[in-house]
Amino acid sequence: MSARVEADDWVYEMFPKDTPPDACGSFASFKRLWDSKRKGEALPAWKDYQLEDFADWYGWINVEDIMPGEPFDTVQRLWGTNLTTAFGKDQTGVRMREMKGSVYSDTDFDMRTKMVETHDFRICYGPANWSAQESWKKTQKQSYIELPLADDGHTVDKFIALT
């Protein structure tokens, strides 16, 4: 059962980690990969992946490290080249809070905090308001799946997303 939030022309859907991949639409194969890296109930770690795992999605992956302490924040560890083209700049090394209002909303912060606690994942879609390409802002839609990662299998310390 998913939880759905609509805000700022975006739809955010949260799913339990055990949701079958086929319930993830066009992201089924990415969810299947994430599931294949899990060990029982544990979450996969970033170190469980090999570059070859992402061959079908090169350029569309981003990975964020969760920063310790409060308030909640992340920093982009990996920002795909196709994302750089779409956004108009490389966001590698940029903090989530630095992108608040342009890329991330309050809803993103709230949902990610919940993902850390519950190990749920989310699928989101909406207009490309953030795009560097002016023509995309009204015509293009973006969708992505975002999944938690944990070096110890339990404490979420990263997010991996496919756009």
Residue ranges and their predicted role:
Residues 5, 10-18, 25-163:
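Sensory/regulatory domains in signal-transduction proteins
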